């Protein structure tokens, strides 16, 4: 994947974010965040008080109130800046996608065949159901399905991957995306969407959508923050009559400062940025999420359904063993197998040549120099091989070789039958080698389990996530692969109906399920799963059923998707813990300063030894604003992620962000107080 990654603080993005932060000062924009709306209203109130003091309408220190007002405005601006910066990064990613969209003409066919008469029309006029012909060098004008032809397609503008891919009619590789380019040959495509509804349009709208819908957890946290704000608002409101009854009423400016410092402004100011950044990180992994809800659900997933081929295994079978028939030595079998594979350019064929070379030092020979004739594999014969020096060597499936042997007057040995069954039972694919009518033995082709996958599954198990392998293999083969890969469970001989039933079973138990898919037959299960990652190379039906699309079409990406989702939830929880813990230090700073004149006993709470009541209040307000700026990188990048159990993760975050939230404000407020004193501003 070669898509350019944005630096955390691009100069252009910073300038745009500062401009947007000022624009977001409007009441309508602030109302969307109730906590920051209280800070905004407090800023307006203290500004009006400052003006009234300057004009002599009310008594009080205009300088002190003005400085408090200034830092309250900074608090609002910093929160706006965090959100604007996160949105700006997403919009920059969207702009790179917009560059893919090009105004072009399309050859709209009057009949669904490549030699039909065509009309040149603007691509914007194409409608769902239209048939178009696309040739080498053309931009594909719409999303659709290939109904005729095959071609090499450059999808780098969408996926960031420079290697071209093959798109052809039939099967699971018939889906094409508008904006990609044909490199060779031609395709006849049936458009599947109307203008403005293409995959690219939906990607751009999702990435740059300013009116982002809040996720359920985000809504729940917002309700908690509103409740805390109301509690602190009521508590602060009661302090004025309390102090007035004591004979020395606290000023409105001090009460406003106390309120702003006590309400959870840190997480309130960063909450939206965390959500936007989560979707941006997902896009950075080349995964398009249709909503923040999908990203959040990925963090809560506790069951992963993983296809065996391509996800758990490499997907290309490799020769792993030569098993000779009775009376045949292994070297003879290896030599015949290598000869039959010399001109076989498939991964399986090359692996047979290499295994024979490794086991018996059989050097690769040139077919032409041997004056041999290579017999290619066909769907009808299901065999391939070589004719050399009156020797007829073939390799192929068990059934094909049996028919070949019997047609040449031979018989298929019982011991080879047993070897074939043993190979299949161990999760490998048997290929039988024959010379003339004599069966020489079996080649075991094994789909290799990916390196390190067992350790990754162990990490997922620590986190409380169950892994389930999905395969069409028989139960014995599936069991062997499951044991080797270290998955928790498996579904053998899987059908679309069986996958759908399994997902519903887990969901009935209260679990959240994630899966990947690329075929039309995967669509029902993708639609049912809580996190459904469709492959970009898959069919249109699969992409529409999923709530995420992996542009790299890498099924293993599902594990990374879960990591990103969990990181977003951890970031939100960690900063919430830090924000609430902050209140303790601010309490020790402001309460003694506000009420020491009325109740001298409260001086005992001035554990930080702050210089004066005014410097204590101002230091707390300044710290409250600056901490938002210092935490913006953490909100955008996410907290450090480690694969731990829920309880271990909770303990770790309480130590780091809970204790940190208690200690950092004490240090920060004291440092600011000292600086104010040194500058003569205390």
From Swiss-Prot:
Sites where the protein binds ATP: 344, 348, 377-384, 395
GO cellular component, as recorded: plasma membrane
UniProt catalytic activity: K(+)(out) + ATP + H2O = K(+)(in) + ADP + phosphate + H(+)
Enzyme Commission numbers on file: 7.2.2.6
InterPro entries xref list: ATPase_P-typ_cyto_dom_N, ATPase_P-typ_P_site, ATPase_P-typ_TM_dom_sf, ATPase_P-typ_transduc_dom_A_sf, HAD-like_sf, HAD_sf, P-type_ATPase_bsu_IA, P_typ_ATPase
Pfam families found in the cross-reference section: E1-E2_ATPase, Hydrolase
N-terminal signal peptide: none
Catalytic residues (UniProt): 307
Localization, UniProt: Cell inner membrane
Record-listed Mg(2+) binding positions: 518, 522
EC supergroup of this enzyme: translocase
Function in brief: Part of the high-affinity ATP-driven potassium transport (or Kdp) system, which catalyzes the hydrolysis of ATP coupled with the electrogenic transport of potassium into the cytoplasm. This subunit is responsible for energy coupling to the transport system and for the release of the potassium ions to the cytoplasm.
Summary of subunit composition and partner proteins: The system is composed of three essential subunits: KdpA, KdpB and KdpC.
Name of the protein this chain belongs to: Potassium-transporting ATPase ATP-binding subunit
């Amino acid at each position: 994947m070669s898509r350019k990654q944005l630096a955390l603080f691009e100069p252009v993005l910073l300038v745009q974010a500062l401009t947007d932060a000022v624009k977001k000062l409007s009441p309508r924009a602030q109302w969307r965040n109730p906590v920051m709306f209280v800070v905004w209203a407090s800023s307006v109130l203290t500004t009006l008080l400052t003006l009234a003091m300057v004009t002599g309408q009310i008594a009080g220190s205009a300088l002190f109130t003005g400085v408090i007002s200034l830092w309250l405005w900074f608090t609002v601006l910093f929160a706006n800046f965090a959100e604007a910066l996160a949105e700006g990064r997403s919009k920059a990613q969207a702009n790179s996608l917009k560059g893919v969209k090009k105004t072009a003409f399309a050859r709209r066919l009057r009949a669904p065949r490549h030699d039909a008469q065509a009309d040149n029309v603007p691509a914007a006029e194409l409608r769902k159901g239209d048939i178009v012909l696309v040739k080498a060098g053309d931009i594909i004008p719409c999303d659709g399905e290939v109904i005729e032809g095959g071609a090499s397609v450059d999808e780098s503008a969408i996926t960031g991957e420079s290697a071209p891919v093959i798109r052809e009619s039939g099967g699971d590789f018939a889906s094409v995306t508008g904006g990609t380019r044909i490199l060779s040959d031609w395709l006849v495509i049936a458009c599947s969407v109307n203008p403005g509804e293409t995959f690219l349009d939906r990607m751009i709208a999702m990435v740059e959508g300013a009116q982002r819908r809040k996720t359920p957890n985000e809504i729940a946290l917002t309700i908690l923050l509103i409740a805390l704000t109301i509690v602190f608002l009521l508590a602060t409101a009661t302090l004025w009559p309390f102090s007035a009854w004591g004979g020395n009423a606290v000023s409105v400016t001090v009460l406003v400062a106390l309120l702003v410092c006590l309400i959870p402004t840190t997480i309130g100011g960063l909450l939206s940025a965390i959500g936007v950044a989560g979707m941006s990180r997902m896009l950075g992994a080349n995964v398009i999420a249709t909503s923040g809800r999908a990203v959040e659900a990925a963090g809560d997933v506790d069951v992963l359904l993983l296809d065996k081929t391509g996800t758990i295994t490499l997907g290309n079978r490799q020769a792993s063993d030569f098993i000779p028939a009775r009376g045949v030595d292994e070297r003879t079998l290896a030599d015949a197998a290598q000869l039959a594979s010399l001109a076989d350019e498939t991964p399986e064929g090359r692996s047979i040549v290499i295994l024979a070379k490794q086991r018996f030092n059989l050097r690769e020979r040139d077919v032409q120099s041997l004056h041999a004739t290579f017999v290619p594999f066909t769907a009808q014969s299901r065999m391939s091989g070589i004719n050399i020096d009156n020797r007829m060597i073939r390799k192929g499936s068990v059934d094909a070789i049996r028919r070949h042997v019997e047609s040449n007057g031979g018989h298929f040995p019982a011991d080879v039958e047993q070897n074939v069954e043993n190979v299949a039972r161990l999760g490998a694919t048997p290929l039988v080698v024959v010379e003339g009518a004599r069966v020489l033995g079996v080649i075991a082709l094994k789909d290799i389990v990916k390196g390190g996958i067992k350790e990754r599954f162990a990490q997922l198990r620590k986190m409380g996530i169950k892994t389930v392998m999905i395969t069409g293999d028989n139960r014995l083969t599936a069991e062997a692969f499951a044991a080797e890969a270290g998955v928790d469970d498996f579904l053998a001989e899987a059908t679309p109906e069986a996958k759908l039933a399994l997902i519903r079973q887990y969901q009935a138990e209260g679990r959240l399920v994630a899966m990947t898919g690329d075929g039309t037959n995967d669509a029902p299960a993708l639609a049912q799963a809580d996190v459904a990652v469709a492959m970009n190379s898959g069919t249109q039906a699969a992409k529409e059923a999923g709530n995420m699309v992996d542009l790299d079409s890498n099924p293993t990406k599902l594990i990374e998707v879960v990591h990103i989702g969990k990181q977003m939830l951890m970031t939100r929880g960690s900063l919430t813990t830090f924000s609430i813990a902050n209140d303790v230090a601010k309490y020790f700073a402001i309460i003694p300063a506000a009420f020491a004149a009325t109740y001298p006993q409260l001086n005992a709470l001035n554990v930080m030894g702050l210089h004066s009541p005014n410097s204590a209040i101002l230091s707390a307000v300044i710290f409250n604003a600056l901490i938002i700026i210092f935490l913006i990188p953490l909100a955008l990048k996410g907290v450090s992620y480690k694969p731990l159990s829920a309880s271990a993760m909770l303990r770790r975050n309480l130590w780091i962000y809970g204790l940190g939230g208690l200690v950092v404000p004490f240090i920060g407020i004291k440092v600011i107080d000292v600086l104010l004193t040194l500058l003569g501003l205390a």
